[in-house]
Amino acid sequence: MAIKERVGLVVSDKMQKTVVVAIENRAPHPKYGKIVVKTRRYKAHDEDNKCKVGDRVRIQETRPLSKTKRWQVAEILNTKA
């Protein structure tokens, strides 16, 4: 089975070793055809606390690390500053 990966934007880094990553999904509405943007937020493990708000990161699925955390930061693609 392939490892699931997502690319998103860090929207919160206020927790220790955890970041919240927002991932946008753009899809046409089934009836009206308008492009609808849906945002999903994932908590991801950041072992070294390197991620900052505004960074674009790649996350990958892992074993459950806590009640709500099932993803880990694989790499930082772009930094904000």
Curated annotation (Swiss-Prot):
Q: Name one GO molecular function term.
A: rRNA binding
InterPro entries of this UniProt entry?
NA-bd_OB-fold, Ribosomal_uS17, Ribosomal_uS17_bact/chlr, Ribosomal_uS17_CS
User: Which biological process, per GO, is one annotated for this protein?
Assistant: translation
Instruction: Name the UniProt key words of this record, in alphabetical order.
Output: Ribonucleoprotein, Ribosomal protein, RNA-binding, rRNA-binding
PROSITE patterns given in the database record: RIBOSOMAL_S17 (PS00056)
CDD domains (alphabetical): Ribosomal_uS17
| Residue ranges of coiled coil | none
Provide the Gene Ontology terms for cellular component: cytosolic small ribosomal subunit
Checking PANTHER family in the record gives:
40S RIBOSOMAL PROTEIN S11 FAMILY MEMBER (PTHR10744), SMALL RIBOSOMAL SUBUNIT PROTEIN US17M (PTHR10744:SF1)
Assembly state and interactors? Part of the 30S ribosomal subunit.
Question: What is the recorded function of this protein according to its Swiss-Prot or TrEMBL entry?
Answer: One of the primary rRNA binding proteins, it binds specifically to the 5'-end of 16S ribosomal RNA.
The entry assigns this protein to a family as follows: Belongs to the universal ribosomal protein uS17 family.
Under which name does UniProt file this protein?
Small ribosomal subunit protein uS17
The organism is Nostoc sp. (strain PCC 7120 / SAG 25.82 / UTEX 2576)
Q: Which gene encodes it?
A: rpsQ
